[in-house]
């Protein structure tokens, strides 16, 4: 794995773990194992990225396959597979490693947590070369804002103002 992808994955894992920890602390879930699952999924979400840069393919699909093959853990693999895009309507309850990793990945610009607006502005500059790509980036931005709004309510914390310090969500303000 390229070192910059490893640093990015550690950043995503920290946020995903903090979201899961918050869910346990607030009673949004009665499944404390979500903390370890979210940490693992965050660390592994881009496990195949270096491979696909060199050889092609979907890093999410290949990575999920590797996770199932090496760990047998389908919950972690599901988060790896869907971290790029959740193609269905959102369920009411987003307290799950899939949504923790999706959200954390969308907040992580390289190896730092930034707001969704900052992250998507960066994506537009770097990848918004055509009307089609700009439209896709905008759809992802809107989807991520919905996830942020729902998770903020479910975790009773204003995520748009948050970062992670010492494994805990804290306000950036």
Per-segment meaning from a language model:
Residues 1-30, 44, 72-74, 85-173:
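Divalent metal-dependent phosphate-bond-processing catalytic cores, especially two-metal-ion Mg2+/Mn2+ enzymes
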Residues 12, 31-67, 79-87:
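His-Asp-centered metal-binding catalytic motifs of divalent-metal-dependent phosphohydrolases/nucleases
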């Amino acid at each position: 794995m390229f070192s910059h992808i490893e640093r990015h994955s550690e950043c995503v894992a920290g946020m995903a773990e903090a979201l899961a920890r918050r869910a346990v602390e607030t009673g949004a879930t009665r499944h404390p194992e979500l903390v370890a699952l979210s940490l693992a999924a965050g660390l592994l979400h881009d496990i195949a990225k270096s491979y696909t840069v060199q050889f092609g393919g979907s890093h999410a699909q290949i990575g999920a396959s590797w996770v199932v093959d090496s760990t047998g853990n389908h919950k972690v693999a599901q988060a790896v597979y869907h971290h790029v895009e959740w193609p269905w309507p959102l369920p009411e309850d987003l307290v799950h490693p899939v949504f923790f990793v999706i959200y954390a990945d969308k907040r992580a610009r390289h190896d730092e947590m930034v707001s969704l607006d900052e992250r998507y502005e960066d994506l537009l500059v770097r990848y918004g070369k055509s009307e089609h790509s700009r439209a896709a980036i905008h759809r992802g931005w809107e989807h991520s804002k919905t996830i942020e709004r729902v998770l903020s309510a479910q975790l009773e914390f204003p995520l748009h103002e948050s970062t992670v310090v010492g494994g805990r969500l804290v306000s950036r303000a």
